């Protein structure tokens, strides 16, 4: 007896029964939702073939259904199939509705797309809105289907790369590259794609853990660049020839590019004040998990002006103009976070925003020769030169990063990037060296109620234990502590480098009761209308000073230095106060020279600043890494998310001169939608104290700060992020 014939498996992917060409329809139960969608797809193809149609050459309704079924697939086979049929949709002609095997049957019952493990069921999308398709049909009757699905010729290359890179990024929990990306067709010119979402989702995972998923969407306006070239520009001080003010030195060299940078690296892009209130009141720790962003619904328009007086502007949709998109996944280009310049995407989801121009520093030699070190009354020699030939690093996006070309209706996705960062505490510490360990034993306790009746201590020379002085005086000032909480650092010190003077950075800490802001690293924020300014009616910019909550600051004016060996009497020779000269030099103060940073130093991380603060930063490529960054609380151990660049491609006229650096161009601009998802994990606070704690809230007096005025003006106030106290020891 002959053995039973084996069922044809075709070229199915490993782990699947139906996902792949050439398999039979009786392989048993599908292995997962993607495999089930493939089984329905194969059955539809079988009906096409029996009706005399060729579904392999044409893009069919079955292909479109498979794309929708696998839109949220998490398995590799579902993603590969999803992107394969999207590429087919872009390049193959479409079967008419009468060719569908379902047209002669009963009307199909509408079902929601198949749910994939780990994905949310998508909400209902409205029917596609055709913006230009009707006009295109009138002008090109038989070719409208092909034109509406037009896409870059690189789609077949980029879609598989995007799928593969996204898979590798999903499996790489240690960060690494900036994620893979690629452009893809949107199903036709004028077809609405994507969604607008600015919600923040809090998913409670149990055991005190929370997953925070922040969604952000913005309408971005992009004009064509003023020029198509790269320009090396020297910048000198604005007051040339005037007596030099070294703290106002601005001289540098920068490379100006024709590209724009889309930067979402600021807390205000992702959270609103209510979100931040919930986070700061209930979370004690937070960490970055993943980040992805997308460009979609691209619209490109041209502007022509009539010869009349005054001229009339005419706006036309340009279906052939291109938007250039580049993602620096390997961080090849200079890293330029926009938050310190207040040039990120805007903080208000209902307002259109714009990207900032991409530029970076270039090496230069700065010559600044003050005539005297005792005053600023004389003129300072001011000059700048091109840097040494061994230091020049000129980068262009065109030869450093792959570039995708998008047309009207197209979209681009970066893929998922996974962070590798240290968790950030959302609590503040109140303990200083004076409050670490066991307090001294009291000699007597008060018997009368009231803080004005204190306890007493034994005589200083009768207390037991060990301390840091050679005499017998054991006081709270001389008691030994396990470590140095915070540290004293020189401030208002301007170091001088090859590029010119710069103020040494200080890790921001809270003030002492003496309100010494600058010695404790206070940060001054200045912002415009997109980032917190109340209205544009006033030319005065909005400003505020930020001081963290953690109480490890210093009061330099109260510091002193005792002579050795220690004398208990405060004689003139025994105590060095800030007003005392050092080495006979006038105006040289003790607090400017003392630095107590060392191996015993314990300090808190940089605090997050809502809304204007930067979220993550790139690690410096040095052998010895800094412990903290002043600009951002999260420092990526590997490459940070890749920078996203956009630029309108040159829209040239027939008047072209190859010997000219500038060519006549058709005035072109673009509006497109940007959206992103930033994911965190957080720990909820536990109530283990008796007393209630301070919370971020509103009052009848300040609620007006969070609502618009009668002309639509609204202000973004800075909010503290570390209200919950914690003990260090």
Curated annotation (Swiss-Prot):
Position of the signal peptide: none
Ranges of Polar residues composition bias in the record: 24-34, 98-107
Keyword Metal-binding annotated: yes
Comp. bias intervals (Gly residues): 173-186
Motif placement: Nuclear localization signal: 4-12
Region described as Disordered: 1-38, 94-129, 163-186, 437-465
GO molecular function, one term: structural molecule activity
Localization of this protein: Virion; Host nucleus
Region (Phospholipase A2-like): 18-63
A biological process from GO: viral penetration into host nucleus
Miscellaneous comment as given in the Swiss-Prot or TrEMBL entry: The capsids of autonomous parvoviruses expose a proportion of VP2 N-terminus and part of that sequence can be cleaved of to form VP3.
Domain statement: The N-terminus of VP1 is sequestered within the mature capsid. It contains a phospholipase A2-like region and putative nuclear localization signals.
Name of the protein described by the UniProt record: Capsid protein VP1
């Amino acid at each position: 007896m002959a053995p039973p014939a084996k069922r044809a498996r075709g070229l199915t992917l490993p782990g699947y029964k139906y996902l792949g060409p050439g398999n039979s329809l009786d392989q048993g139960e599908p292995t997962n939702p993607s495999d089930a969608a493939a089984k329905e797809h194969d059955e539809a193809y079988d009906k096409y073939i029996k009706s005399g149609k060729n579904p392999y050459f044409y893009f069919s309704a079955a292909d479109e259904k498979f794309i929708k079924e696998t839109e949220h697939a998490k398995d590799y086979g579902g993603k590969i199939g999803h992107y394969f049929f999207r590429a087919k949709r872009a390049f193959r002609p479409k079967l008419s509705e009468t060719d569908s095997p379902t047209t002669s049957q009963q009307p199909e019952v509408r079902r929601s797309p198949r749910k994939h493990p780990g994905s949310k069921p998508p909400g209902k999308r409205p029917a596609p809105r055709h913006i230009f398709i009707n006009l295109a049909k009138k002008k090109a009757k038989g070719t409208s289907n092909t034109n509406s699905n037009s896409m870059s010729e690189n789609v077949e290359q980029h879609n598989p790369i995007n799928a593969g890179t996204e898979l590798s990024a999903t499996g790489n929990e240690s960060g690494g590259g900036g994620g893979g990306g690629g452009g893809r067709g949107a199903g036709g010119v004028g077809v609405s794609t994507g969604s607008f979402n600015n919600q923040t989702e809090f998913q409670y995972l149990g055991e005190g853990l929370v997953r925070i998923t922040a969604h952000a969407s913005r309408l971005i306006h992009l004009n064509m660049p003023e020029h198509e070239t790269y320009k090396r520009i020297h910048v000198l001080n604005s007051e040339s020839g005037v007596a030099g003010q070294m703290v106002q030195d601005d001289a540098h060299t920068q490379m100006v590019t024709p590209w724009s940078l889309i930067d979402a690296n600021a807390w205000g892009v992702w959270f609103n004040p209510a979100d931040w209130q919930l986070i700061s009141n209930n979370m004690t720790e937070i960490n970055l998990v993943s980040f992805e962003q997308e460009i979609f619904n691209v619209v490109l328009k041209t502007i022509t002006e009539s010869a009349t007086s005054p001229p009339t502007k005419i706006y036309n949709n340009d279906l052939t103009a291109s938007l250039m998109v580049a993602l620096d996944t390997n961080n090849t280009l200079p890293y330029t976070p926009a938050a310190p310049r207040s040039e990120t995407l805007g903080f208000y989801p209902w307002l259109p925003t714009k990207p900032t121009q991409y530029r970076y520093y270039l090496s230069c030699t700065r010559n600044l020769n003050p005539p005297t070190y005792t005053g600023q009354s004389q003129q300072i020699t001011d000059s700048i030169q091109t840097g040494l030939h061994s230091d020049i690093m000129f980068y262009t996006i065109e030869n450093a990063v792959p570039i995708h070309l998008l047309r009207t209706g197209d979209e681009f996705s970066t893929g998922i990037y996974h962070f590798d960062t240290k968790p950030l505490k959302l609590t503040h510490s109140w303990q200083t060296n004076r409050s670490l360990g066991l307090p001294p034993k009291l000699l007597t306790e008060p018997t009368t109620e009231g803080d004005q009746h204190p306890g007493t201590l034994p005589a200083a020379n009768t207390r037991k234990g060990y301390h840091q002085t050679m005499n017998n005086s054991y006081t709270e000032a001389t008691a030994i502590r396990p470590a140095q909480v915070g540290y004293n650092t020189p401030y208002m010190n301007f170091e001088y480098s090859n590029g010119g003077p710069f103020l040494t950075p200080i890790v921001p800490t809270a003030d002492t009761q003496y309100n010494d802001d600058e010695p404790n690293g206070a940060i001054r924020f200045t912002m415009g209308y997109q980032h917190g300014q109340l209205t544009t009616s006033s030319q005065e910019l909005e400003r505020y000073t930020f001081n963290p909550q953690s109480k490890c600051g210093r009061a330099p004016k109260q510091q002193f230095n005792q002579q050795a060996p220690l004398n208990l009497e405060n004689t003139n020779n025994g105590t060095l106060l800030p007003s005392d000269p050092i080495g006979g030099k006038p105006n040289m103060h003790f607090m400017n020279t003392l630095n107590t940073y060392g191996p015993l130093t314990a300090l808190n991380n940089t605090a997050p600043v809502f809304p204007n603060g930067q979220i993550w930063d790139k690690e410096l490529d040095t052998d010895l890494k800094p412990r903290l960054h002043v600009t951002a609380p999260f420092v990526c151990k590997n490459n940070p998310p890749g920078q996203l660049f956009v630029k309108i491609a040159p829209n040239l006229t027939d008047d072209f001169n190859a010997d000219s650096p500038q060519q006549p161009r058709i005035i072109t601009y673009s509006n497109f939608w940007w959206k992103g998802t930033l994911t965190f994990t957080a720990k909820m606070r536990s109530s283990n104290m008796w007393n209630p704690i301070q919370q971020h809230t509103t009052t009848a007096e300040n609620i007006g700060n969070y609502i618009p005025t009668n002309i639509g003006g609204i202000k973004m106030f800075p909010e503290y992020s570390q209200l919950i106290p914690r003990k260090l020891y």
